[in-house]
Amino acid sequence: MSDDTPLAHSLPTPVAVLGDGCAALSLAAQADRLSDYALSVIAPAGTGSTQDHIWGFWQMPWLQDVLPLVRKTWSRWTIRNAETAVVMQAAEYPYHAVTRQHWMAHCMARATQHGVTFAEDRSSLDDVKQRHIFDSRPPKRHPDMMLQHFIGWEVRAAAGSFDDSTAILMDFRCDQTCGMHFIYCLPFSDREALVESTLFSPALVPDTFYETAISSWLNDCANVSDFEVIRREKWAIPLGLMARHDPALSGIGGNGGAIRPSSGYAFSFIQKQIATGIARVSAGNALGFVTPHRPIDLWMDRIFLSVLRHQPQHAPQIFTALAARLTGDEFALFLSGEATMALRAKVVSAMPPWPFLQALLRPEAGAKVGPP
């Protein structure tokens, strides 16, 4: 029977996703919106991460499916250094937190409900054309890449210890000797909060560096000296452009350019990438995924990363100046990849010019800024 017969056209096209991380399961959860495709997820047993951690994101149109699962929402957040504290307020785009395990369990349940198949070996790929295989395995990174690396403690303290109306996105009142370093604190209640020591640098540091920073911040800045650590998380996210895991296969998620190079934000951009791919199918195009980042944003990110690598001492002033210049909603739009040219100009005008002019003249700043 030829492929041109009506019966052949009525059969769903086999599609496979390699890996079972956030991108693979987020796509699988929406299999009901891809009725012309039969989706399978292929990952060897035991390869997926079992560590739970928090994914933060600003409310955007492509994240509606996540909203019922959020653990906490903040319309106010703070960015501060030793001299200045800026409180930002969002009217349209609040900041949310969802736990990895909660989201992944939700996606797995929906995927199973929608008939997605799961396999542990690649033998099921025999009937799948190469252009219909999407690889979500981690991309290849250069050993000298900038990293966002952190250790987080979820802590419990006495009632009234935390102000859960305001998230602390960046507090630079911590050791700045190893790169751009800040404390990130998400208060889930007046008793419980996630407190992370986050560092941007090419090299990891001993765990004691992060842990000392967390303890010191809790004691000296939050005035919380008596607390219990109820959960720990540890992660490192490569920053910049990376080659695909397998150049012969199309990528999705981090392997498809979804990680924001300057910030390491991935969760929101993975959902955006998948939403765009599904919209393309709805418009009559073949299923495929492209980077969710605009070329101009990738170029700006490359310049910004150069500043953070070579002149991290400017970071506290850069971020507090940016927070002071933008509204909360503008800040959310910019970091979510939804900036207009006017907003980008506003961001640039808030930056100290000399470090960025120096970064612009470095050879690395002129390198390729598009996806590999």
Tell me the role of every PLM-derived stretch.
Residues 275-372:
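C-terminal helical "tail/cap" subdomain of flavin- and related membrane-associated enzymes
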Residues 20, 110-228, 240-245:
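Predominantly flavin-linked oxidoreductase catalytic cores and closely associated redox partners
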Residues 185, 190-191, 246-263:
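Short FAD-binding loop at a beta-strand-to-alpha-helix junction that anchors the flavin cofactor
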Residues 4-40:
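N-terminal Rossmann-like FAD-binding beta1-loop-alpha1 element of flavoenzymes
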Residues 74, 78, 101-117:
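N-terminal Rossmann-like dinucleotide/flavin-binding domain of flavoprotein oxidoreductases
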Residues 203-233, 247-250, 271-295:
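Flavin-binding catalytic cores
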Residues 177-180, 234-251, 307-313, 320-324:
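FAD-binding beta-loop-beta segment adjacent to the flavin cofactor pocket
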Residues 26, 30-83, 102, 151:
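N-terminal FAD cofactor-binding segment of flavoenzymes
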